[in-house]
């Protein structure tokens, strides 16, 4: 299991309004922009901007991450061997595959394995 990248989640009211500020802070355009369920997301540097209806914010705040890994299945095997529990997934998304795991300390973490195209686009 290799961690390739982590993001700080930031909840914003409007992605189109917030995105230019974070692109300016980072000094680069967004690496990714996509919809997921009721949310619209953009990855800029090490920030993951999330815009969603107020009623859905708590659902997205309940987990930490995403933690981008090289191999989701291997990561799940390693984590469950240390008493982590899969609480959701693995699922397929626009960027690859993901799963939610609860660590023995109670932390709920989202793990993502990017598709080869997304990995190449973001990491080079």
Question: Model segments located where?
Answer:
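N-terminal beta-strand motif that seeds the catalytic metal site of vicinal oxygen chelate
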Residues: 1-19, 63-65, 115-124
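Vicinal oxygen chelate
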Residues: 5-13, 41-43, 55-124, ...
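Short strand-connecting beta-turns/loops that link adjacent beta-strands
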Residues: 15, 36, 93-95
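Conserved active-site alpha-helix within GNAT-family acetyltransferase domains
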Residues: 16-25, 99
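Intrinsically disordered, low-complexity acidic/polar segments
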Residues: 17, 74-76, 110, 120
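Short secondary-structure junctions
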Residues: 26-34, 85-90
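Conserved short beta-strand elements that form part of the metal-binding/catalytic scaffold
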Residues: 28-62, 108-115
């Amino acid at each position: 299991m290799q961690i390739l990248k982590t993001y700080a989640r930031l909840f914003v009211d409007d992605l189109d309004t917030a995105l230019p500020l974070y692109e300016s802070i980072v000094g680069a355009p967004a690496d990714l922009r996509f919809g997921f369920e009721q949310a619209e997301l953009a990855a800029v540097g090490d920030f993951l901007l999330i815009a969603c209806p107020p009623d859905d914010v708590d659902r997205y705040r309940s987990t930490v991450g995403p933690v981008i890994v090289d191999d989701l299945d291997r990561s799940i095997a390693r984590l469950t061997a240390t008493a982590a529990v899969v609480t959701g997934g693995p699922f397929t998304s626009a960027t690859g595959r993901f799963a939610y795991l609860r660590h023995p300390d109670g932390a709920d973490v989202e793990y993502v394995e990017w598709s080869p195209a997304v990995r190449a686009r973001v990491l080079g």
